[in-house]
């Protein structure tokens, strides 16, 4: 993970204010991923989690662009923390969420994430495999179209938007299926086999943030 490095110049504004872990999540997808992680955030009541998608003019959306955006936003928050002398404005963890698909920039994105302290989670072939694992086993290799077809069978009106009753509570079941499909895909900044995802690492991080929030 990427712990926040608090410069000596940063101070806590009040003695009675307890630290809360802040998490930044940058998604490659504009709709589904953002909607899912906002749902997870609400499910765990993890207030100090900020979720956004990569939307930078001239970059497009590919794994390298997502990692660059994660670095940019994290560093911007660090600068604000220094400027305002408030360590709580910085992020403790920064995550980027991408697919394998046919992206030529994925290997470069992994290298940049490792060198920049970004936790890059990668789904193969696409993020929807994680959603599908909330519902059913799916151990065999699949194309993105295969997964979308199977997900549409579970969600008849699925059009990238998740229903209000999506089973976020079944994330542990999805994690178990992901671990069974690729037992080695248990750390950020690596590619897994088809199918695979390590999104559960981020979901567990959001869950921890929610538990810490309740203890405040």
Where are these regions (language model features)?
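C-terminal accessory helical subdomains adjacent to catalytic cores in phosphodiester-
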Residues: 1-4, 8-22, 34, 38-55, ...
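Conserved beta-strand elements of the Class I
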Residues: 24-26
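Short acidic, Gly/Ser-rich segments with clustered Asp/Glu that frequently serve as metal-coordination loops
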Residues: 29-33
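A broadly used, surface-exposed interaction patch
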Residues: 56-83
